[in-house]
Swiss-Prot record:
InterPro entries: P-loop_NTPase, Sulfotransferase_dom. This is Cytosolic sulfotransferase 4. The active site is at H121 (proton acceptor). It comes from Arabidopsis thaliana. Disulfide bonds: none annotated. 3'-phosphoadenylyl sulfate binds at K74, C75, G76, T77, T78, W79, R143, R239, K240, G241. It is an enzyme of class 2 (transferase). GO terms for molecular function: sulfotransferase activity. Belongs to the sulfotransferase 1 family.
Length: 273
């Protein structure tokens, strides 16, 4: 199966009878917008997203050269996927190329035969069974959870898409400690503060190191206009990308509540925000 056909297959979200039966047995709730969600392998999904996850677990055949970009939603997935695509294909598409694919395409619609590049919001343990016999690489990017909130209430309750946040981030943090050659843990804030050092780190992890003489990291504008094939605007994948923007929205009481939750959930993990 070629990459494009596989992607369509993995997005086929018609609920099977098997999935409907599974959903009836799972913990269920509603998200902040009133959409029905269910908890599968410790993670909350809409019913259609769950079908896609099950399709992935059943049909995906990893290749050792695959690269998977993972994150919680709104943590820099599109940015990291664009950087990863640029790094592994820079011999074919240098950043100064006026016809670079990223100038006219969203990173999420770009396909390449090798290495294949994918992105996901699934937690590490959901990927693990599928990838257990593969040496493919996973790059995870996390971000201060206060800058990723959809709603304060859903975060505190832990009932949000691909959440709870703390369970997902811990799943990748622990995997990166257990298997640093195949799982890289990155931080959005560090990428903003020291882009050259972090991109160098990413390139080395991907076995695509930057030239030693290179003094700076070239910039490449990503296409933020147009629509994807399923009709979603490209701009829906982009936010301000500002570090600390949460201060414009959260009260001191809300900030303290979130800090207390995170301190409790990440206790003794070695991971700090």
């Amino acid at each position: 199966m070629d990459d494009k056909k596989m992607a369509v297959n993995l997005r086929n979200d018609d609920l099977s009878e098997e999935t409907k039966t599974l959903i009836s047995s799972l913990p269920s709730d509603k998200d902040s917008t009133g959409i029905n969600v269910c908890k599968y392998q410790g993670c909350w999904y809409t019913h259609h997203f769950l079908q896609a996850v099950l399709n992935f677990q059943k049909n995906f055949k990893p290749q050792d050269t695959n690269i998977i970009v993972a994150s919680f939603p709104k943590c820099g997935t599109t940015w990291l996927k664009a950087l990863t695509f640029s790094l592994v294909h820079r011999s074919k598409h240098p950043s100064h190329d006026h016809h670079h694919p990223l100038l006219s395409n969203n990173p999420h619609v770009l396909f390449s035969s090798s290495p294949r590049l994918f992105s996901t919001h699934m937690p590490s343990h959901t990927l693990q069974e599928v990838l257990k016999d593969s040496t493919c690489k996973v790059v995870y990017i996390c971000r201060n959870m206060k800058d990723t909130l959809e709603t304060f209430e859903s975060f505190c309750k832990g009932v949000n898409f691909f959440g709870p946040f703390w369970d997902q981030v811990l799943s990748y943090w622990r995997r990166s400690l257990e298997d640093p050659n195949h799982v890289l843990f990155m931080r959005f804030e560090e990428m903003k503060a020291e882009p050259h050092e972090q991109i160098k780190r990413l390139a080395e992890f991907l076995d695509s190191p930057l030239l030693r003489k290179k003094k700076r990291t070239d910039c490449l504008e990503i296409n933020k206009t147009g629509k994807l094939c399923e009709g979603r605007d490209n701009k829906t994948f982009f936010r301000k990308g500002e570090v600390g923007d949460w201060k414009n929205y959260l009260t001191p009481e809300m900030e303290n509540k979130i800090d207390m939750i995170i301190q409790e959930k990440l206790q003794n993990s070695g991971l700090k925000f």
